[in-house]
């Protein structure tokens, strides 16, 4: 993911920081919980979202395929012994850790080849009361990313029926809510939050 390695150092703009603060509040609101103790962030990037959900008593594991992003992630949380990262492609391999009460993934699922299988893999990592929160684009016309191939994009967002089918096939409940509208290319791109639970 060369694009993300190059973009890593300029990734944390004030706009993105504020956006992820709002996303974190939406997750807590929809999940009906204010705090989480063991968090896994899939496609963590620089930890923009995970960092917003981290408390003094919680741990955060960030996984990503981009070395550049993980470098920034590690620098950002270097003083916190409860935060660590792994360079892992979760579609090709696995991690030993489990029993997370919150698994989050923001704007990463459109980079996956088989999102439905990933839901199943992450379901196995949840604690009994754990939730999986996925944030991504609503189905769009393919214009959101300027160069989808170069940027490793496999899906132009996701339709509501698709998300519901992931839940059904993995025996999970799902709540879906539009939490943002991104304005670019003279268009509006809705962003959803899907909360999966047992």
Predicted regions mapped to residue ranges:
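A conserved beta-strand element that flanks and buttresses the S-adenosyl-L-methionine
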Residues: 104
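A short glycine-rich, Lys/Arg-flanked "PGG" loop and its adjoining helix->strand segment in the class I
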Residues: 117-131
